[in-house]
Curated annotation (Swiss-Prot):
Top class in the EC scheme: ligase
Binding-site positions, ATP: L10, S11, G12, G13, L14, D15, S16, A17, T18, V19, V20
CDD domains assigned: QueC-like
SUPFAM superfamilies cross-referenced by the UniProt entry: Adenine nucleotide alpha hydrolases-like (SSF52402)
Family: Belongs to the QueC family.
Protein name per its UniProtKB record: 7-cyano-7-deazaguanine synthase
GN (gene name): queC
Pathway: Purine metabolism; 7-cyano-7-deazaguanine biosynthesis
Catalytic reactions on record: 7-carboxy-7-deazaguanine + NH4(+) + ATP = 7-cyano-7-deazaguanine + ADP + phosphate + H2O + H(+)
Cofactor: Zn(2+)
Known role: Catalyzes the ATP-dependent conversion of 7-carboxy-7-deazaguanine (CDG) to 7-cyano-7-deazaguanine (preQ(0)).
Assigned keywords, A-Z: ATP-binding, Ligase, Metal-binding, Nucleotide-binding, Queuosine biosynthesis, Zinc
A GO BP entry: queuosine biosynthetic process
Free-text comment on the cofactor: Binds 1 zinc ion per subunit.
Length: 224
């Protein structure tokens, strides 16, 4: 019997690393995809490669995209500062249509691989309020995927799996530790330095630190 395959979006951060471990524990042959899209630092891409090796994925791809030219986000436009305190509404670290673009490319690879499952580490509990992390988005993308692909119209539909959707950050960390994730390999900070050290001030750093504290697990994050 052939092992079921999954394409997994792997940013190099805590959430996506956990998703890879979950998929592997569920018996999937894991194919991971990361994006060099003009983000502020490459440390997360290096982290993604480390995580892919540690968790033993079948293949890890890094896709080049230039989102700098569009701007519109503190993660792709150096002229927009990364906020270091909570704000109302959708934060400036939101990258326009990022998850839509990333999932579309993962969908293409999944169709080539004859993989029926695509995993993404979005979360609607301890998150920054991005519209493309909501359950409604995941459900809508799955419907689109099955309308827009050869596999979908031939009855071999895709599933967009978001296993972290309703978990707290502490629950995510506990799930990853139980499945052997080395969180010391991951980078979550929006403005990490070249060594992957975190600022400890941005929204992503706060969510990560609070999650480790709530989980009762030592935080391996290095700070500059």
């Amino acid at each position: 019997m052939n092992q079921k395959k999954a394409v997994i979006l792997l940013s190099g951060g805590l959430d996506s690393a956990t998703v890879v471990a979950m998929a592997k524990a569920d018996g999937y042959a894991c194919y991971t995809m990361s994006f060099d899209y003009g983000q502020r630092h490459r440390a997360e891409l290096q982290a993604a490669e480390r995580v892919a090796r540690q968790l033993g994925v079948i293949e890890h791809k890094v896709i080049g995209l230039d989102l700098n030219g569009m701007g519109g986000s503190a993660l792709t436009d150096e002229s927009i500062a990364v906020p270091e305190s909570p704000s109302e509404g959708i934060p400036v670290t939101y990258v326009p249509a990022r998850n839509t673009v990333f999932l579309s490319l993962a969908l293409g690879w999944a169709e080539v691989l004859d993989a029926r499952d695509i995993f993404i580490g979005v979360n609607a509990v301890d998150y920054s309020g991005y519209p493309d992390c909501r359950p409604e988005f995941v459900e809508a993308f799955e419907r689109m995927a099955n309308l827009a692909t050869k596999a979908g119209v031939e009855g071999n539909g895709f599933r967009i799996q978001a296993p972290l959707q309703y978990l707290s950050k502490a629950q995510i960390i506990q799930a990853g530790v139980a499945r052997g994730v080395d969180y010391g390999l991951t980078v979550s900070c929006y403005q990490a330095d070249e060594q992957g050290r975190a600022c400890g001030k941005c929204d992503s750093c706060r969510l990560r630190a609070d999650g480790f504290a709530a989980a009762g697990i030592s935080d391996p994050t290095p700070y500059f």
